[in-house]
Amino acid sequence: MPRKGPVPRREVLPDPIYNSRLASRFVNRLMYDGKKGVAEKIFYGALENLSEKTGEEPLRAFERALDNVKPQFEVKARRVGGATYQVPMEVRSDRQISLSIRWLITYARSRGEKGMVNKLAAEFLDAFNNRGGAVKKKEDTHRMAEANKAFAHYRW
């Protein structure tokens, strides 16, 4: 925690092709070692691939895939009298986006397809159709929150 108050959030500039801040955030998260050009090539290639398979506009299909992965609830550990409880909490909208982006990229990287463009496109398509690793992660998170609903009164 900084002593001089909250650190201001930096605004992410919209991406050059779709003029979307969401796409820009995704590219920044996908990037390794500052190689933004490579990350953009992967992202835009995956979107074109997704658009061909769904027949929808690329950005709209991406946003729908992202919406299908966004968690509504999560559990946070809370210590009460020596015991740690998993307390279900609602997820803030900015965190929903961050988690869904992180999960999509993580599960895309762990897929078996050849090349990151194909892996990401396949994960987008699965998320678009409510399947895949990222959607399963969201469902697991919701299941954990549901199972620990009894501890909801420990919310702070």
UniProtKB/Swiss-Prot annotation:
Keyword tRNA-binding: yes
CDD domains xrefs: uS7_Bacteria (cd14869)
Keywords: Ribonucleoprotein, Ribosomal protein, RNA-binding, rRNA-binding, tRNA-binding
UniProt-listed InterPro entries: Ribosomal_uS7, Ribosomal_uS7_bac/org-type, Ribosomal_uS7_CS, Ribosomal_uS7_dom, Ribosomal_uS7_dom_sf
One annotated Gene Ontology cellular component of this protein: small ribosomal subunit
Gene Ontology terms for molecular function: rRNA binding; structural constituent of ribosome; tRNA binding
Database matches in Pfam families: Ribosomal_S7
PROSITE patterns (alphabetical): RIBOSOMAL_S7
This protein's record includes keyword Plastid: no
GO biological process: translation
Highest taxon, organism lineage: Bacteria
Family membership: Belongs to the universal ribosomal protein uS7 family.
Chain's role: One of the primary rRNA binding proteins, it binds directly to 16S rRNA where it nucleates assembly of the head domain of the 30S subunit. Is located at the subunit interface close to the decoding center, probably blocks exit of the E-site tRNA.
Subunit structure: Part of the 30S ribosomal subunit. Contacts proteins S9 and S11.
Name this protein carries in UniProt: Small ribosomal subunit protein uS7
Gene responsible for this protein: rpsG
